[in-house]
């Protein structure tokens, strides 16, 4: 059964409450890694066919590998024979399994997130995968852009960024935090409440940790998009209220191909989930084998 037909069959089965099992289920192995900072990170790994590229999927802001749409996309790709790695960023927590609340104390930084992405990409490459595709969702897409802007592993042949949108923050809060840090009037133990993404005035973090995310604004993100060291494609939802209407054109102006899926929201719910997986699979089929 082809990927498109299997996806459509699942959708029809879901409408009638039927559980449609994959023909060749790929069992996930949970792997652990002790990072240089001593934190234990985890990921689910499923081995696929050597002729297909390996895929690393990264979840959105404060979420885990079990969060949609990356969790369902990972299942679909594994069923289609792709090697799939889905890490959960630790955000400074050993073996993190739950989404992190806005009200939690956030000492993690963008730099730490990038280091973890690098670790897992290298982990895949060290297992012999010479063709790796990175797929991110929402802020996970932004984190991947910053990873690509550094020294990405040469095994990364393609990047697919879904629901790539600017990370919402308040300019006055940013300027105040910058002033506090510049005047050395803060410490790692001095926490404050900020607005960041969907955390509206209740994102608790030290100034420096907060600034690591917000000083990388959408203008810098767009600038880096045009300088990535691996080919990038962007997939957006036509009904995504988290982006302004001119956002797709701003991305295209950087020379990046953009696909807008009609009626899809930020999480590609309902039938648009299958439109997303169809588009992703069509891209993956053009790439070299994961292992030779």
Label every PLM stretch briefly:
Residues 105-108, 154-283, 287:
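The alpha/beta-hydrolase serine catalytic core
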Residues 134-136, 162:
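Short beta-strand immediately N-terminal to the catalytic nucleophile in serine-hydrolase-like folds
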Residues 27-48:
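N-terminal cap/lid segment of alpha/beta-hydrolase-fold proteins
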Residues 91-108:
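Cap/lid segment of the alpha/beta-hydrolase catalytic domain
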Residues 104-127:
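Alpha/beta-hydrolase active-site loop
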Residues 50-51, 55-92:
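Short, surface-exposed "cap/lid" segments of acyl-processing enzymes
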Residues 2-13:
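Bacterial N-terminal signal peptides that target proteins for export
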Residues 136-140, 144:
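Gly/Ala-rich beta-loop-alpha elbow adjacent to hydrolase catalytic centers
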